[in-house]
Each structure stands twice: as C-alpha cells, then as structure tokens.
C-alpha cells in the first residue's frame, strides 16, 4: 500500500543539519525563527506573555508563509495554555495550513492530547480532510494513539471516513500493524469489510503482510473471506502472492469450516479464535498452526503454482488494460 503520510521524511525547504531550527516532536513543523513574525514565534515557543502582547498589534488568525496561524504552531508544539488563550480570544479553529491540515490535525499528528481536548471542547471539526484526504482519525490511527482516537470518535469523528485512496482509519491501522488500534476501531463500530478504491478490504491488507494476529482479530469481527477486489483476488490470494503459504492454507481451511462446519485435523492445532458478539460462530475453529495434514510438500508446491498462476493472469490483464490496481510487494 502506498504510503501517503510522509512522517519522518525530509521535505524541500527543511533546514540542513546544524541549522538553528526549533526542536519538534514527530510530525511537527520544522521552523526557521527568522521567517516567523513575533506572534508566531511566541506561539511556537509557548511564550504566553508575548502572545498576549502580540495580539495587541496583530490579528489572532494571522498567517505565515506556510499559511500557519499561531494556533497551528501552539498546537503542534503542545502549548496548551497558549491554545486556551487563543481559543478564548475567538481565533478560528478550522483554518488550513499549506498541507490542508487544521490545528486539530496537527495536534493529533504530534500527539498533543491536552491541545486536542481543548480544541474539541470548543467545537473544532474532527472531520476535515487534508491534501491526501486524511482526517484527524486517520492521523490518530497511524500515530498510533488509542486515547486520541477514542476522543475523536466521542466527538463524532466519522469512523469510516475514506482518504483519497479509499482507506479508512481501520485500513491504515492494519497496514501499520497496529493491533490495539485495530481492536479499538472495531469495538467502536468500524466497518470490518471497508473497501478502498481497489475494493481491497482490511483482511486483504493483513493477509498481504502475513499478519496472523490481525487476521484473527478481523475474522472475529466478521471479515468476509470470499470478497474479491477489482483484480478478482481474495484475502487467500493475497497471502499466496506475497509468499505467506501457511497463512493462505489456514485461510482456506477457515473458509471450508465456515462453509461446511468442518475442518481438517491440521487446522485444529493452532490458537483458538475467541468468541465475540460479532463472530460467535468462529468459536469452534482454531487458526494459527500450519495445515500440514494434506502433505506439507504438496502444499508448498501447490501454493507456488497458484502464486505464479495469479501473477501470470495479472500480467495478462495488465497488458490488456484491465488491471485497476497493481500488486504491491
């Protein structure tokens, strides 16, 4: 899956090593002091006295060259007292910077919990989207910060909001291997079968990464094993394509069990899939041990043949212009 956040990457215009830029948490702005006005510098530094003084001469919503307001900078750097003062001074809460991110998004991205709480309590919109279509909840899912995610959901953040690739916060949490976040979102009602622009589900994403624990969590909440994406592939196919032969065999066993209520002996030696209100029927099946009862050598050979067949068919479709989504290795 394409990475669309860019956390930790060096952006054009970032100061070179050894330059005098303000230290910042992950996701925060890289700042050159000389490029900021007095009010913006004071907000970024958390100097409340200077912020008070600056408001006598400058508008509370003044922008710098990157379209950041003092509130953006105070939120990114976690200066809750400055945030409170600016909010009480009637600053606008939902203005965008150059990346189309609001102060709330920056506070979430930088995991400034007090600032997030202040903004939400004063009516900041949790459902605004940045240049990539990500909302504050997408950013919390990737952080990952379950406390912030829970707070956003309590303030009516759309739990199944889709970014420009069609990914929901759940899909991103799965792609980043964040099991605690995945479980929180599912408990809060996230769609376990949400589909991106290529019709891929979170289960397919988990299978692509060989994430057995996440696969089990998703199955407990009713993930659909039979669903096919725009290439006609299932989660089992994705496990095969990415070389997770044991997982693909277990998914096949699970599908057989769902359809017939019976599973082979090899599929019953793994870790049980606990019963939940969402997936009570999964209590009778175990997932986790290699399904070796059909002959291990034969399985390896068959999955290798299946992988080659799938990739060959994909190449043929691609040559004919019928492929909408490519394989990501």
Task: Give short role names for the model-derived ranges.
Residues 1-38, 155, 188, 220-224, ...:
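Ankyrin-repeat-protein effector appendages
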Residues 34, 65-66, 98-99, 131-132, ...:
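Ankyrin repeat start-site detector
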């Amino acid at each position: 899956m394409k990475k669309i956040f860019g956390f930790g990457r060096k952006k054009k215009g970032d100061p070179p090593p050894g330059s005098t830029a303000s230290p910042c948490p992950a996701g925060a702005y890289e700042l050159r002091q000389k490029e900021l006005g007095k009010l913006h510098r004071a907000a970024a530094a958390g100097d409340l006295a200077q912020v008070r003084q600056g408001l006598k001469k400058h508008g509370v919503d003044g922008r710098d060259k990157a379209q950041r307001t003092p509130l953006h900078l105070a939120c990114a750097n976690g200066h809750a007292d400055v945030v409170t003062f600016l909010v009480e001074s009637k600053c606008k809460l939902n203005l965008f910077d150059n990346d189309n991110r609001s102060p709330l998004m920056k506070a979430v991205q930088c995991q400034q919990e007090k600032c997030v709480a202040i903004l939400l309590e004063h009516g900041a919109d949790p459902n605004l989207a940045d240049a990539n279509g990500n909302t504050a909840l997408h950013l919390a899912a990737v952080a990952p910060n379950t406390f912030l995610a829970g707070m956003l959901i309590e303030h009516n953040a759309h739990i199944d909001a889709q970014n420009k690739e069609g990914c929901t916060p759940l899909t991103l949490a799965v792609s980043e291997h964040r099991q605690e976040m995945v479980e929180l979102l599912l408990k809060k009602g996230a769609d376990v079968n949400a589909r991106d622009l290529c019709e891929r589900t979170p289960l397919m994403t988990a299978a692509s990464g060989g994430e057995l624990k996440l696969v089990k969590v998703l199955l407990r909440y009713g993930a659909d094993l039979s669903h096919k994406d725009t290439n006609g592939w299932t989660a089992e196919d994705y496990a095969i394509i990415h070389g997770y032969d044991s997982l693909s065999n277990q998914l096949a066993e699970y599908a057989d069990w769902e359809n017939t209520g019976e599973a082979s002996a090899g599929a019953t030696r793994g870790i049980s899939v606990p019963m939940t209100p969402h997936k009570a029927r999964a209590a009778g099946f175990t997932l986790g041990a290699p399904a070796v009862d059909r002959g291990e050598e034969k399985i390896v050979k068959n999955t290798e043949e299946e992988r080659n067949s799938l990739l060959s068919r994909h190449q043929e479709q691609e040559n004919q212009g019928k492929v909408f989504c490519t394989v990501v290795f």
